[in-house]
Amino acid sequence: MKLLWKLHSGLPREGPGSDEATKRVLSLLPQRRFTRILDVGCGPGMQTLCLARCLAGNIVAVDNHQPYLDVLASNAKAEHFESRVETLNASMDALPFDDGTFDLIWSEGAIYCMGFEQGLNLWRRLLTANGIVVVSELTWLSSNPPEESRRFWKRNYPAMESLEGNTKLVAGSGYELLATYLLPSKAWFRDYYDPLERRIDLFSEKYGRDAALLAELNAAREEIDLFRRYHNVYGYVFYAMQRGLLPEAKGTP
């Protein structure tokens, strides 16, 4: 397990994404001043720093792996954001905040850890009355994906939904969908897959006699190769949502 953490340590990101994508999604939100922002599953915080550059509010960045938080804290200090970026080691399904604390919740590539619908339901109480949540979620882009890709994701993320399916979950969880944005395929590679693949090559040479680790490395390589072949079949979609009424409350006097 320590070697697997080492495999990922020092990568720019812990999942697909880019500053350009983060800024693009921010441009799709209603133009308002966000004063209290929560970044859930922040990892080493590349998107956290992008949010800090683009927004004037205070940010709480949450992850349950302290080394990632240490990297973020160091980088935030280097950019003079230490007064606005706070790190917190906590679980995303037990966030220690009062109701209505945040006017913007952001989470890139992390909500899958607890499930899209469950995350939306649990985080909703943390938002102000008209607060906004933005998440990127792995999403089927084809109604009939090739069998190889279907088998892989059934094994690794069986809860993956289509855009239509996630849109229904958004409404059922008490949100108004404001916008969606498909992460460009190039944003999977520059800061994530490309450096990860180089690390996989190095680890394969160094630890090739460790059968268990080699199996993990091969699984990571399989994921990268799969996306090269099927990037038009699935991808990360950003969902920007505003807190609204729960379905059962609509129409209530």
PLM features: residue spans?
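Conserved alpha-helix/loop element of class I SAM-dependent methyltransferases that forms part
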Residues: G15-R33
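Class I SAM-dependent methyltransferase SAM/SAH-binding core
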Residues: L38, M46-A94
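A short acidic, Gly/Pro-enriched loop at the edge of an enzyme's catalytic core
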Residues: D93-L104
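A short SAM/SAH-binding and catalytic strip from SAM-dependent methyltransferases
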Residues: L104-E117
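A short glycine-rich, Lys/Arg-flanked "PGG" loop and its adjoining helix->strand segment in the class I
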Residues: Q118-I132
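Short, glycine-/aromatic-enriched active-site segment of Class I SAM-dependent methyltransferases
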Residues: L138-Y157
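Short alpha-helix
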Residues: A159-G174
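Conserved Class I S-adenosyl-L-methionine
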Residues: L182-P253
